[in-house]
């Protein structure tokens, strides 16, 4: 059981109750009921108030009479009740604040501090507001009950943890969030909010823009009408005062009052003009504040867009650099392959026992049978060379030339390829083939047929290569130049034909061979004509 110490008793002044005397009732135990304790406290407070003041016999008769008396309207009662309520609320707030720190101060000291604070705010209470005081006592008792319950819970917790001595009561820690994640969420949420606000503002401004001129005209018209009406009223007042002055000629005081009224009306007109101007200024300032807020939102939205643009631009630049590096590496690989192929071809041509490079010409589209024949011959040559590779046997470490590289890039050094092929044909066969073919020597007819076949193959391959060169050069060259040259040639041929037809001289029907050693087409075809006479035709 905890005892509540009260402050030293003081004599009541002017028949008022002592507010500093609190509810001196014991705290409830575990088996007690809250309602009974509250009723006991109220009864004890009533008894104390009746003993000290002697004016409580009316209030202790019945609670119904107390309620009826409290409901009666009275200005003094309302004022006193408001003061007591404020004091009680402040006291209860202080008690609640004190009950949260039971580990630092004992309960009695907190009660004393609460009563001292309530005594500083209001020290006297009227007899008519005693019902309010009882409500204040009930609130204090409830706060004391809460404080006692918290104290018991802390004591029970201390007793339970004492024998074990293993449990350590730690204060609850706040949940820690990741700063970066929270900042990113906040920034994204802020950006979304700013964007939504920007959309709302832009839509509102666009909608207001359509009716802005009409609204301005209407407001100006209403302002002008109000000013005109005010001026008319002021002029009417002045006229009435002027009509009143002759009636008040005998009375000096009335004349002075009329003059003062005239001056006040003039000042009123000036004040109305000033009020109108100040009102316009105030409206402009308010509109400027609203517009400044909207502009701030728009500026923030633009900054967000700039930040997003800078981020995406940086990502785009990085992607471009990565693509350029990949393109460079991809382009460098074919160049290296071409260099290796050239070196390998030169080494193969220099060494008679090494392998020879294989080239397959790409088939032209518009060449017809020539391209097909050349492609078939190249395929035959490739099959023969592959058989020679199988006979000779290649090393495992050597790489065979890739065919698709030569198919896709046939246009480079075709003449060198053909020359190397001719040299390779004219060169003696490797030692392996000589060792295989020593058993049987070819005859003279076989040699002639083989040389004829090789000559035909070389001619066809050279024609095909020339056609492919011509096609490639035509593709590379500017088509406009080719077209202009072709048009010029056609125009020259047409002009020569026309000049020959226009400026041709008339000749006799009989062909003559005087002074001309060249035989014309007429002289050749003249004997085959239908004219059968041998002499010249008649003139």
UniProtKB/Swiss-Prot annotation:
A cellular-component GO term for this protein: chromosome
Topological region Cytoplasmic: 1-479
Disulfide pattern: none
Sorted UniProt keywords: Chromosome, Coiled coil, Cytoplasm, Cytoskeleton, Endoplasmic reticulum, Fertilization, Immunity, Membrane, Nucleus, Phosphoprotein, Transmembrane, Transmembrane helix
Tissue-by-tissue expression: Spleen and thymus. Expressed at high levels in pre B-cells, mature B-cells and pre T-cells. Expressed at low levels in mature T-cells and plasma B-cells. Expressed in circumvallate (CV), foliate (FL) and fungiform (FF) taste papillae cells of the tongue epithelium.
Pfam families in alphabetical order: MRVI1
Entry-annotated residues carrying Phosphothreonine: 78
Annotated TM spans: 480-500
Phosphoserine modification, residue list: 347, 354, 408
Subcellular location: Endoplasmic reticulum membrane; Nucleus envelope; Cytoplasm, Cytoskeleton, Microtubule organizing center, Centrosome; Cytoplasm, Cytoskeleton, Spindle pole
Coiled-coil stretches noted in the UniProt entry, renumbered to this chain: 298-326
Molecular-function annotations in GO: microtubule binding
Compositional bias ranges of the Low complexity kind: 74-92
Topology relative to the membrane: Single-pass type IV membrane protein
UniProt region (Disordered), positions on chain: 1-21, 69-98, 147-171, 334-353, 418-449
GO biological process: immune system process; nucleus organization; single fertilization
Family, similarity comment: Belongs to the IRAG2 family.
Subunit structure as annotated in this protein's UniProt entry: Interacts (via coiled-coil domain) with ITPR3. Interacts with SUN1 and SUN2. Interacts with microtubules. Interacts with HCN4; regulates HCN4 channel activity.
Function comment: Plays a role in the delivery of peptides to major histocompatibility complex (MHC) class I molecules; this occurs in a transporter associated with antigen processing (TAP)-independent manner. May play a role in taste signal transduction via ITPR3. May play a role during fertilization in pronucleus congression and fusion. Plays a role in maintaining nuclear shape, maybe as a component of the LINC complex and through interaction with microtubules. Plays a role in the regulation of cellular excitability by regulating the hyperpolarization-activated cyclic nucleotide-gated HCN4 channel activity.
Protein name: Inositol 1,4,5-triphosphate receptor associated 2
Native source organism of the sequence: Mus musculus
Record lineage: Eukaryota, Metazoa, Chordata, Craniata, Vertebrata
Gene this protein is translated from: Irag2
